[in-house]
Amino acid sequence: MNETIELKTLDNHNFNAFISRPDSKPKGGLVVIQEIFGVNEHIREVCRKFMKEGYLTIAPSLFDREGKNIELDYTKNDISKGRILKEKYNLLSLNEIKSSVEYVKSAGKVGVVGYCWGGSLAYRSGCELTNINCSIAYYLSLIHI
């Protein structure tokens, strides 16, 4: 089953999250972290694919502090908007991720996977948050050695 739910962060911010629940007992929980485009059809499809593999999957909407359900296109203007939003909410986004981890941890072990900016957040989540058993960063950005 797929649906959008509302969660709350520890700093009392309400945000939406897309949930994909398998029909049978989940193998574990998975937090899917968006790119700079929001929780768009690509991210929802990623959630559905992991759900078909048996995982309780959640994608927090990290731009909800700016406005609900922000979805950007892959155009030059929207990429610019996404970069601005990324900079504005980069540090705060761990709050939404933490609440999402707490939501899916009842399914068992919890993984975090992120794409581009979300990959950077997945890396940070694995380093800074508790209750995460695995963190995967796909083509991450913002990590400097």
Where are these regions (language model features)?
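Serine-hydrolase catalytic machinery in alpha/beta-hydrolase-like enzymes
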Residues: I5-K105
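Structured loop/turn residues at beta-strand edges in well-structured enzyme cores
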Residues: K25, G108, T130
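Conserved small/polar residues in nucleotide/adenosyl-binding loops
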Residues: E71, I143-I145
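Gly/Ala-rich beta-loop-alpha elbow adjacent to hydrolase catalytic centers
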Residues: G114-G118
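Short glycine-enriched nucleophile-adjacent loop
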Residues: G119-L129
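A conserved short beta-strand
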Residues: N131-L140
